[in-house]
């Protein structure tokens, strides 16, 4: 009885043949349908009805379980016979009632298999369906790959993914910030406001925004750009007006609040009042001043200028267009922008825009003519030295005679 039920149920398992000693060997009409049934369809299990086919993802799993059960129940020889059976049906030896009943059961199952095979080809699983999100991701991948390869994705040309990416619109003005086009009236008002004030406070900005029908952000950005343009213009003007510029090795200008030592206004008997030194009287026609000092320096371009205030020793100034003092010792005196301790009054002097060049310990002092004890109108040497004064004692505080200028 158990064998009979087993062979009766065998019709449901894909139409395989299970021969008995007293029955015919039979085969399905076509093994292709049986193979399709065993591969893709899970309706061959005895639990399910052959007509109902649930669209689930676990069909293959159920099919595998059923086939495993059938293979465990069947013999090894029968399995090999199933794999090696040719397409045409085999000849039958002797019919039996059991085989006829199994054929009756087989016929509806085979018809169900034939009706289910077209459904397999038409069925689309959820993971096969193309959703909007998948399409968008695919379009993004194609577009990015096309941009990397330099291909025209935005013109509808096929990209590396083999599709024409029409999903994305080409990047136009909508994706970028629109450039603000100011009218002439707005530009005039903005320029006028910038002329009076380069930085706008917020109340004034709000007022101008309402007046010019602009946003505060537009006005703020316009003022930022205008300030940058103004800085560039100032830089270009500065370079154009001063071709040499203020290089670090150029001497600083001697006209300023820090250089108030000697000036051309000392004429008419005005004395220079330092904190401790006595007033200088008897000014002559051309006093040593800033104008007189800077006048001869216009013709020469100094290379190097170092003021060593500690090494400066003050020197007396004689008459003939110079200051002199009999009691300059032990008193700080303003020389070349520095107050230094004075030495005894000596022969060399400042005379009408010429730097004194007394001979002694050398101090680097460029753009000054190298002048020994005598005065001479000579050209500027590139690297002359400003030397200290020889300590000539002034006899009884009297002024020494004026030395002559000579050019070395």
Swiss-Prot record:
CDD domains: homeodomain
Subcellular location: Nucleus
Domain of life of the organism encoding this protein: Eukaryota
Entry-linked Pfam families: DUF4074, Homeodomain
Keywords: Developmental protein, DNA-binding, Homeobox, Nucleus, Transcription, Transcription regulation
Compositionally biased intervals (Polar residues): 68-83, 134-143, 387-398
Motif Antp-type hexapeptide in this chain: 124-129
Main location: nucleus
Cystine connections: none
Chain residues forming the annotated DNA-binding region: 175-234
Regions of compositional bias (Low complexity) in chain numbering: 91-116
Spans annotated as Disordered: 1-27, 44-120, 132-179, 233-278, 376-408
Keyword presence, Acetylation: no
GO biological process terms held by the UniProt record: anterior/posterior pattern specification; embryonic skeletal system morphogenesis
GO cellular component labels: nucleus
Gene Ontology MF, one: DNA-binding transcription factor activity, RNA polymerase II-specific
PANTHER family documented for this protein: HOMEOBOX PROTEIN HOX-D3, PROTEIN ZERKNUELLT 1-RELATED
Function: Sequence-specific transcription factor which is part of a developmental regulatory system that provides cells with specific positional identities on the anterior-posterior axis.
Entry's family note: Belongs to the Antp homeobox family.
Protein name as it appears in the record: Homeobox protein Hox-D3a
Organism whose genome encodes this protein: Takifugu rubripes (Japanese pufferfish)
Gene name per UniProt: hoxd3a
């Amino acid at each position: 009885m158990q064998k009979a039920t087993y062979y009766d149920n065998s019709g449901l398992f894909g139409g395989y043949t299970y021969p008995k000693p007293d029955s015919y060997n039979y085969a399905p009409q076509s093994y292709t349908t049986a193979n399709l049934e065993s591969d893709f369809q899970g309706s061959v299990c005895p639990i399910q009805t052959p007509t109902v086919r649930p669209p689930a993802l676990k069909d293959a799993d159920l099919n595998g379980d059923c086939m495993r059960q059938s293979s465990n129940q069947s013999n090894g020889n029968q399995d090999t016979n199933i794999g090696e059976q040719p397409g045409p049906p085999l000849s039958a030896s002797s019919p039996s009632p059991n085989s006829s009943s199994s054929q009756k059961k087989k016929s509806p199952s085979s018809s169900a298999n034939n009706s289910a095979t077209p459904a397999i080809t038409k069925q689309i699983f959820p993971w096969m369906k193309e959703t909007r999100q998948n399409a968008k991701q695919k379009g993004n991948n194609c577009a990015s790959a096309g941009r990397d390869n330099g291909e025209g994705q935005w013109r509808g040309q096929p990209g590396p993914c083999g599709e024409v990416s029409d999903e994305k619109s080409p990047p136009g003005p909508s994706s970028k910030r629109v450039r603000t086009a100011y009218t002439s009236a707005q530009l005039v008002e903005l320029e006028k406001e910038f002329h009076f004030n380069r930085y706008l406070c917020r109340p004034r900005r709000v007022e101008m925004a309402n007046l010019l029908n602009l946003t505060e952000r537009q006005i703020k950005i316009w003022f930022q750009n205008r300030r940058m343009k103004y800085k560039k213009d100032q830089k270009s003007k500065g370079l154009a007006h001063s071709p040499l510029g203020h290089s670090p090795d150029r001497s600083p200008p001697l006209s300023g609040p820090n250089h108030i030592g000697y000036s051309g206004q000392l004429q008419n008997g005005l004395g220079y009042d330092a904190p401790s030194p006595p007033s200088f009287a008897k000014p002559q026609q051309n006093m040593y001043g800033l104008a007189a000092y800077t006048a001869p320096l216009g013709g020469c371009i100094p290379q190097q200028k170092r003021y060593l205030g500690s090494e400066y020793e003050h020197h007396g100034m004689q008459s003939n267009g110079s200051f002199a003092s009999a009691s300059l010792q032990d008193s700080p005196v303003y020389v070349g922008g520095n107050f230094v301790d004075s030495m005894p009054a000596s022969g060399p002097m400042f005379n009408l825009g010429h730097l004194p060049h007394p001979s002694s310990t050398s101090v680097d002092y460029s753009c000054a003519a190298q002048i020994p004890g005598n005065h001479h109108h000579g050209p500027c040497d590139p690297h002359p030295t400003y030397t200290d004064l020889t300590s000539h004692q002034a006899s009884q505080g009297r002024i020494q005679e004026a030395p002559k200028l000579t050019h070395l």
